[in-house]
């Protein structure tokens, strides 16, 4: 019957494409080591890591050298903007240094990747503030571990008129949002808004399409 067909199909699927493929012990230890390191990167499974490792082996030596130099230089020389905590080549990032942007509006995000996602929409012309994560008691991340005090210092200077909270809708994200709201109550002159919740629960901005992000920003609501 149908159940039998499905059982056979699932059996074949598991044989052909195991959920968590591992490299045979008979394979080169060097290949295993490189694949293991590559699979530590977010979004890279063992199968993709194996393909990348083999591709690296086929690349021209100069290309591999350029790649490793770029990674070394990035890790050595990259800075965090003193104002917003965004990644930058200089002490102040290009966004904060851009006088044509709206310096009265700040969009608060969790990670640098969120800045890139919003910038790709080309619809937002204000500034940003990167928290560096979300409050998570389970992971031992307290408010003091994030760049929240730096945000409050920026607001206290009196230039900012609106703070947009673009935090994920996870439990940790909601916890962070409510904590920020409590801290921002001491600045009644600042309008506090939150992006529209068209973004699904638990979704991170980094993985949301540009159209949805644009809609969420344009339809942000004020939080009383």
Task: Spell out what each predicted region is.
Residues 81-84, 95-97, 124-126, 130-153:
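Basic, flexible Lys/Arg- and Gly-enriched helix-loop patches that mediate nucleic-acid binding at interfaces
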Residues 121-128, 136, 182-189:
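A short alpha->loop->secondary-structure connector
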Residues 189-193, 204-224:
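Conserved phosphate-handling catalytic cores of large alpha/beta enzymes
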Residues 25-31, 40, 50-115:
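Cys/His-rich Zn2+-binding cysteine-cluster or related metal-binding knuckle/ribbon modules and their
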Residues 172-185:
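Short Gly/Thr/Asp-enriched flexible loops that form oxyanion-binding sites at enzyme active sites
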Residues 1-20:
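N-terminal targeting leaders
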């Amino acid at each position: 019957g149908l159940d039998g067909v499905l059982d056979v199909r699932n059996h074949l699927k598991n044989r052909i494409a195991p959920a968590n493929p591992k490299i045979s012990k008979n394979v080169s230890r060097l290949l295993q080591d490189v694949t293991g390191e590559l699979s530590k990167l977010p979004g890279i499974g063992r199968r993709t890591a194996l393909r990348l490792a083999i591709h690296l082996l086929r690349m021209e030596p100069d290309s591999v050298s350029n790649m490793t130099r770029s990674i070394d230089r990035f890790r050595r020389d990259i800075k965090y903007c003193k104002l917003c905590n965004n990644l930058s080549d200089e002490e102040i990032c290009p966004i904060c240094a851009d006088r044509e942007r709206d310096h009265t509006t700040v969009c608060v995000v969790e990670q640098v990747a969120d800045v890139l996602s919003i910038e790709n929409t080309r619809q937002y012309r204000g500034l940003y503030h990167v928290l560096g994560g979300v409050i998570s008691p389970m992971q031992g991340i307290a408010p003091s571990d994030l760049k929240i005090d730096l945000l409050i210092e920026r607001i206290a200077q009196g230039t900012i008129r609106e703070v947009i909270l673009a935090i994920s809708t996870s439990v940790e994200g909601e916890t962070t949002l409510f904590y920020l709201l409590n801290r921002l109550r001491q600045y009644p002159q600042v309008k506090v808004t939150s992006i529209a919740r068209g973004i699904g629960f638990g979704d991170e901005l980094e993985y949301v399409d540009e159209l949805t992000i644009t809609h969420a920003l344009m339809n942000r609501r004020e939080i009383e």
